[in-house]
Amino acid sequence: MLFFRGINSINMDAKGRLAIPKRYRESIAEASENQLVATIDLHSPCLLIYTMDEWEVIERKLMSLPNMDPQARLVQRLLLGHASEMEMDGQGRVLLPSLLREHAKLEKEAILLGQGNKFELWSQEAWDASRPEMLDSASVGDVSESLSSLSL
C-alpha cells in the first residue's frame, strides 16, 4: 500500500494539467500503472485523488451501502458521480476535468497534501483561508472518542 505524506506547492497550467511531484511518480506508476481517480471532498473545498487500486477499494465500500438509504445514495451520487479517471503522462502530469477544477476553485497555484492513502488538492487561496481555522480547531475543544486513544 502506498502512503502519501507531506505538503507540496504545485502549479496548474492553462489546460488544467498539474504535475505530480517526482517523489510520488514511481510509486504511483508501480502501484496503479499511472492511473489515478479524482473526486470531490464532501466536507472541504478540495478534491481527493486516489491511485486506481485504492479507489477500487473505496468504490466497493460505497457500492455496498444500502441504496434505499437516502444519505447513502447521496454520498454514492456525489463521490461516484464526480469520480474521474486520470492517467499520469510521461512527465508526471494529469489533466483535471473542468468540473472538478471548478468545484475546488482551482487556478494556477495549488496545494497537494498527502493524506496517507490519498492526496487532497486545494486551491492555494482556499488552503490559505482554511488552514488557520483548522489549526485553531485542532488546538482547542473536545477530543472525539476516536481520537482520545491516539498518542503522538
From Swiss-Prot:
Its main location: cytoplasm. SUPFAM superfamilies: AbrB/MazE/MraZ-like (SSF89447). One of its GO terms (biological process) is negative regulation of DNA-templated transcription initiation. Residues 7-54, 83-126 form the SpoVT-AbrB domain. One of its GO terms (molecular function) is transcription cis-regulatory region binding. PANTHER family: TRANSCRIPTIONAL REGULATOR MRAZ. Belongs to the MraZ family. This is Transcriptional regulator MraZ. The gene is mraZ.
